């Protein structure tokens, strides 16, 4: 299968080279461009094969065909909440009880398997290219790119906002700037330590009852378990987080939800914002503790 993208050349690129448009205007990565040169009809101009050094003229139709090979993920009929879908990406509101991709503990019951099934039924490729994965136990928006171009472009413009319920009473605003490292390479556990990589987390308190706080969180960096590790490091672990705190309420997952993602569409150039509601158990706790 292939994803075909067509461009009509504007006046300001009249007389310029194909590569100037593809790299400068269409933002095609150097890696993908190199790949397209080896594909039959990977790059054509007005229906004819061309070189990237050839000259463009106003009104020309430039077309690229991006190969979309099938993946090796086994399709599984698992219900998912699709909140947006087009030819270049699909966005899902992930359940906290669903892992993003297969591991030794989860071979067939993952978001990747569910998306493979969904996309197969729609006649689309099923290579799993998640743009920022979420931990099992974290709910919310996961974007999956449907081709190499989308996979290269979306992460460069994506901005995420999370909602979290943390233990204790937080200040109105706060920033945690502490490096994070992996103490044991055989385990997923992370910790704060000077030998780690830079990690910065910002938050704003939405509501608090003195014992718990609902916070809006956004990140400067994207370290594994960053939000969970950072709040635990200041004595305010996420409610339900059995790894970095305790799960006294027996929720089975931390109350952390990716509620909003904003990004520039890889083909149209439109700034898009997607939002997703909290899972039911998190919503009930938020309503009970902080009001509706």
Each model region followed by its residue ranges:
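RNA pseudouridine synthases
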Residues: 1-292
């Amino acid at each position: 299968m292939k994803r075909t993208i067509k461009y009509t050349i504007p006046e300001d690129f009249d007389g310029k080279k194909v590569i100037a448009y593809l790299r400068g205007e269409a933002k095609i990565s150097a890696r993908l461009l190199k790949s397209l040169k080896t594909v039959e009809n990977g790059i054509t101009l007005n229906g004819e094969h061309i070189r990237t050094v050839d000259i463009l003229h106003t009104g020309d139709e430039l077309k690229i065909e991006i190969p979309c090979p099938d993946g090796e993920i086994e399709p599984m009929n698992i219900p998912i909440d699709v909140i947006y879908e087009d030819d270049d990406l699909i966005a899902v509101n992930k359940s906290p009880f669903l892992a993003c991709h297969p591991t030794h503990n989860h071979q067939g019951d993952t978001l990747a398997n569910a998306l493979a099934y969904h996309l197969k039924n729609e006649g689309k490729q099923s290579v799993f290219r998640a743009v920022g994965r979420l931990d099992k136990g974290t709910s919310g928006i996961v974007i999956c790119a449907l081709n190499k171009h989308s996979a290269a472009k979306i992460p460069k413009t994506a901005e995420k906002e999370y909602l979290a319920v943390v233990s204790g009473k937080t200040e109105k605003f706060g920033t945690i700037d502490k490096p994070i490292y992996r103490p044991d390479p055989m385990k997923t556990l992370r910790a704060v330590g000077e030998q780690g990589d830079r990690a910065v987390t910002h938050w704003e308190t939405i509501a608090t009852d003195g014992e718990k706080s609902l916070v809006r969180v956004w990140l400067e960096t994207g370290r594994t378990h960053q939000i969970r590790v950072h709040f635990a490091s200041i004595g305010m672990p996420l409610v339900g987080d059995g790894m970095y705190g305790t799960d006294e309420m027996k929720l089975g997952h931390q109350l952390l939800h990716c509620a909003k993602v904003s990004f520039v569409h890889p083909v149209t150039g439109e700034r898009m914002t997607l939002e997703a509601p909290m899972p039911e158990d998190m919503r009930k706790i938020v309503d009970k503790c902080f009001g509706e």
